A protein has these predicted regions:
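A residue-level marker of the well-folded mature domains of exported/periplasmic proteins
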Residues: 1-177
Length: 177
């Protein structure tokens, strides 16, 4: 039930990604508890998470030197085997070509709306946009692969909306409207 998450630094989209990860983890395991370690502090984030009992460790960013994360070049979610080695399970895949294509098409068609200076534009496109997918390791069991395919398809079709739920903090306070 303990899942480790390595965040790069507590700014910008990192906390949002952590929260999204926690929501997804709890969809399949309501007892899931996410343990957080930052890679921006000295030491090995993966070892710290393992010492706290995490056997599943996730990281949304590319491997970073001296964090102990995914020396094989893998990133995403890994399983810590009995020998202490990271075994890849799944990885998010950002399909930037689809994002760029949609942006360029909207500019060329005249549908691009320019925002006021300093106003943020939302580039957090979900699976339904075709800009994000998931890659599963060959070691993932067939039943889990099947479940992942169902969830992927339902998110792409708008049938599953994991982020339209009431979000509560650790004290039970509602944090969204």
């Amino acid at each position: 039930d303990l899942i480790g998450y390595v965040g790069s630094y507590p700014i910008l989209g990192v906390p949002a990604s952590l929260c999204a990860f926690a929501i997804g983890a709890r969809m399949t395991n309501p007892r899931a508890r996410i343990l957080l370690e930052w890679s921006c502090v000295p030491g090995n984030a993966a070892e710290r998470l393992a010492s706290r009992g995490a056997r599943i460790i996730s990281n949304r960013d590319l491997p970073m030197k001296d964090t102990g994360l995914f020396e094989s070049g893998e990133y995403g979610t890994c399983f810590l085997d009995d020998d202490g080695r990271m075994q890849p399970l799944a990885s998010p895949v950002w399909l930037w070509d689809r994002v760029y294509e949609q942006v360029v098409r909207s500019v060329l068609s005249g549908s691009w709306t320019q925002k006021k200076e300093g106003e943020a534009i939302n580039y957090y496109w979900g699976m339904d946009s075709g800009a994000i997918d998931i890659r599963l390791s060959d070691s993932v069991p067939a039943g889990v692969r099947q479940l992942a395919a169902i969830l992927r398809q339902d998110m792409r079709e708008g049938q599953l909306k994991p982020f339209t739920t009431v979000l509560r903090d650790q004290d039970g306070n509602v944090r969204n409207d």
